[in-house]
Amino acid sequence: MKINIFYQTDIPKYLRRTGLFQTACLQALKNFRREKAEVNIVFVNEKEILRVNKTYLNHHYVTDVISFNHERPPFDMGEPWSFGDVYVCYQVARKNAPKFEHTILQEMMMYAVHGCLHLSGMDDHTPEDRAEMDRQAEKIIASVLD
């Protein structure tokens, strides 16, 4: 599986830790690795995440992360295929990091990993499910940052 990272907003260079994001996301997707599958992690600003949220989910607010699963092609065409996209709002991560006692990098990683956990089939519809996703994300991030 290949993890593509795109920075579509102004993010300080010291936070553009592509290798760390790729490693963390691969761990979150460990049960769904497909050789030719690709996942796109797209860091965006508040305006863009609002646009995506309105356009595709009919939600009229800024959020931290949005993930979209893509259907697997019905047969192997021998070419890479998109497993999913994860949109992460950098500005929300920057604002929320102090509240959760994270660095900005940790908060960005939380959102990217959270989105990948959704792609892997986890949900956060209940407080218990959300807590489990947070535990999984924290565990992955701790292992990557050690």
Say what each PLM segment does:
Residues 1-108, 120-146:
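An acidic/histidine-cluster motif and surrounding catalytic segment
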